[in-house]
């Protein structure tokens, strides 16, 4: 089963950062939302190997961390990053800054 485990996108910017590239790449996944308003939950620990969201299972790959998910999606949908190397470097720098 292909799935993306996230927290509520409005509450968890990390989840939103994982969800966006998956949607932009057009990956067919079941999105499983775990409510995070009350803080970390046992449900996250049960559903993900790292105990964090976002977490992606896709075609045999298991990927956690929003930036790793974005890179995985970009490998499947190369148009996610700019084609020009200078623009791509700037985009990756911005993504890394948001990730830090």
Residue ranges of model-derived segments:
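GST-like domain detector, emphasizing the conserved glutathione-binding G-site
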Residues: 1-100
């Amino acid at each position: 089963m292909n799935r993306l485990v996230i927290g509520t996108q409005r509450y968890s910017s990390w989840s939103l950062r994982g969800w966006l590239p998956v949607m932009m790449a057009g990956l067919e996944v079941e999105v499983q939302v775990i409510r995070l308003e009350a803080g970390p939950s046992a449900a996250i620990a049960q559903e993900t190997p790292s105990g964090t969201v976002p977490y992606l299972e896709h075609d045999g790959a298991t990927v956690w961390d929003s930036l790793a998910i974005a890179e995985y999606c970009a490998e499947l949908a190369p148009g996610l990053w700019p084609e020009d190397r200078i623009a791509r470097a700037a985009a990756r720098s911005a993504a890394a800054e948001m990730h830090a």
